[in-house]
Amino acid sequence: MRKSLITLGLASVIGTSSFLIPFTSKTASAETLDEKKQKIESKQSEVASSIEAKEKELTELQENQSKIEKELKDINDKALDTSNKIEDKKEENDKTKEEIKKLKKEIKETEARIEKRNEILKKRVRSLQESGGSQGYIDVLLGSTSFGDFISRATAVSSIVDADKDLIKQQEQDKAKLEDSEADLNDKLKEVQAALAKLETMQKDLDKQLNEKDKLFDEAKASQKKTAKAISELKSEASELANQKANTEAEQARIKKEQEAAAALIKKQEEAQKASDETQTDDSQTATTESSKASSSDDSSDNSSDNSSNGSSNSSSNGSSSKKSSGSNSNSGGTVISNSGGIEGAISVGSSIVGQSPYKFGGGRTQSDINNRIFDCSSFVRWAYASAGVNLGPVGGTTTDTLVGRGQAVSASEMKRGDLVFFDTYKTNGHVGIYLGNGTFLNDNTSHGVSVDSMSNPYWKAAFKGVVRRVVQ
């Protein structure tokens, strides 16, 4: 009977192991996908912030371009107005020059007439001097035939003299007037030329401003184009990240579904194992009863045989009792093992393979895995403490579910070095490690294998629900 029960137990363990091995990659993938999703969401946040900043930058560039366009229009209007004024001043300048030229011609003509008249007067004076001066006038008067003729001749002579004087005076006045007009026109010409020079300087300055604004306008357009392109690229990246996140979530959902199915199957197998253990206990009790009856029968028939049988029965009973008691101790909860060096011994042994031991779901349950230092989280904790003389369960039967029942529960605020800390990863209490103090713990995880991690890490912080067990003190 015992042999058949052992065979059944081995078959159960082998069956469970064959199921756990392919499940390893799924658990690892689930945790890796969580990290990937966190990275994607972090990148999405960065991209969203970049898009917002770039869109704000684009708006500012567009506003700046509109401002430059208005300034360009104002400068262009001023340049056009200045150009028209320059043309008007040039025309006025040419007209003034023409008027000056005309006045100069008139002045020369007047001067010529005055000069001509002066020559005539000079001849008359010369003639009078040659003829005796006043004697000539007397001869004219004495040559009159009557008194009336005398009066007429005297009046005529006086009129000629006065006319010559008036003509000379008028010519002098005309000349002075022309010279004044010429001076006025020269002053006007200077003013026109000064205004023209000022306008031309203004035109050059406006042309310079136009060139500068054109350059700024081109730069603004180029910046807008560059920023718009950056926004387009960021939006494409955001779209790609959204697709990656959707794919990751879909993969997470698929793995979660498979894990739930696997967990259900494991639970079913555990229930079957429990039923098998109960059957084994019942069979053991039946065998003991039958053996006792047989022993009593032997006692009644033979004294010497009775003593021998009793010795054998006692030996068997003691052995059975010892084994049962040992099994109870290894699986019982609520007992804190006293081992002063166990904690530091376990931590020392476990720390010795940090960074050197890969994670394997279901690993550490064969001698080959143990020799090669290949564990999962629960088998690593069991091995570390076992190496320090603390028994937390059998090699093939220690899981997070059995470890969470070991020792005594303590609050997270009271946990200390050596306590077991549990995390809700792919299931409740799906991961376990040894608390080191200062917010760190020693564990074997899918990402880094055996490592020392911080409980303030966002992933572990979210997974830690305050489950702590003290197994050694």
UniProtKB/Swiss-Prot annotation:
Enumerate composition-biased segments (Basic and acidic residues): 33-44, 251-260, 267-277
Alphabetical GO CC annotations of the entry are:
extracellular region
Q: What induces it?
A: Positively regulated by the two-component system YycFG.
Sorted UniProt keywords? Cell wall, Cell wall biogenesis/degradation, Hydrolase, Protease, Secreted, Signal, Thiol protease
Post-translationally, this protein is described as follows, namely:
Identified in the extracellular proteome as a number of processing products of about 50 and 30 kDa.
Q: Which InterPro entries match?
A: NLP_P60_dom, Papain-like_cys_pep_sf, Peptidase_C40
Protein family:
Belongs to the peptidase C40 family.
**Would you tell me the protein name for this molecule?**
Peptidoglycan DL-endopeptidase CwlO
Q: Mind giving the lineage of the organism this protein is from?
A: Bacteria, Bacillati, Bacillota, Bacilli, Bacillales
